[in-house]
Design a protein with these regions (language model features):
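ATP-binding/phosphotransfer module of carbohydrate and carboxylate kinases, centering on a glycine-rich
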Residues: 1-10, 19-23, 46-50, 67-74, ...
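Phosphate-binding/catalytic loop of phosphoryl-transfer enzymes
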Residues: 10-14, 18-119
Length: 223
């Protein structure tokens, strides 16, 4: 900071957790538990006395999509970020919907198994975070070998059918939860982010399974 302070007017930080951007407070830090219940802005201003703002990473992504990206033309929608967990944001009347306690869109906590509402094994973040992708691929291959996301999609793009089956199962689960979000919130669009969202195969398979849900719904519902 010292080296560039004469050129810096402000600082904006996108971070995980339930964040109150109005006062710069992190109720939680998401997976970064060591910053729970901290006023991050006050701490940073002790070292960097400039204008500083913080925001939940998925909500920051949603603001970017509303202002400059794929959600410029919608009033109501959602953002789903596939990463370590599941980042999420709801968009209402062309604005990020934070909720009364700044926790709207915390999709990581969504339960995917109504028969077990306790175990983290069935949280959306567990099933469809990057670890969930690895587990679906391992199950399909019948192995415990570790792979990175890059290695998984390299194998898929080379035509490994078992890997593609694992990715497809992962995408089926993602599509099911996106369907649930859509049915609850009546989204015009859902933007998918996160590093693996750059993989065309992932988006193709999510769309395929999303369409399949509607094809078998038996009712006319806005899509």
């Amino acid at each position: 900071y010292d080296h560039y302070k004469d050129r810096i007017e402000g600082m904006a930080i996108s971070m995980p957790g339930i964040i109150n951007p109005e006062i710069g407070y992190a109720f939680t830090g998401g997976a970064l538990r060591y910053i729970d219940k901290m006023n991050i802005v006050d701490i940073l201003k002790e070292r960097c006395p400039i204008n500083i703002t913080i925001g939940n990473d998925a909500k920051c992504a949603a603001n970017a999509e509303i202002g400059y990206g794929n959600l410029q033309d919608i009033q109501d929608g959602a953002v789903v970020i596939l990463g370590t967990g599941i980042g999420g944001c709801l968009i209402k009347d062309h604005k990020v919907h934070t909720g009364r306690h700044f926790s709207a869109g915390e999709f990581s906590f969504v339960k995917t198994n109504c028969l077990d509402g306790i175990s983290w094994d069935y949280a959306w973040s567990t099933r469809n975070g990057i670890k969930g992708l690895l587990e679906r691929v391992q199950e399909s291959l019948g192995t415990n070998q570790e792979y990175t996301g890059i290695e998984i999609f390299d194998m898929a793009n080379e035509g490994n059918e078992k890997v593609i089956e694992g990715i497809s199962q992962f995408c089926k689960e993602v599509a099911t939860q996106i369907f649930n979000v859509h049915i609850i919130f009546d989204c015009e669009k859902v933007a998918i982010g996160g590093g693996i969202s750059a993989q065309p195969l992932l988006i193709e398979l999510i769309n395929k399974h999303f369409d399949n849900i509607f094809d078998h719904l038996g009712f006319d519902v806005y899509k």
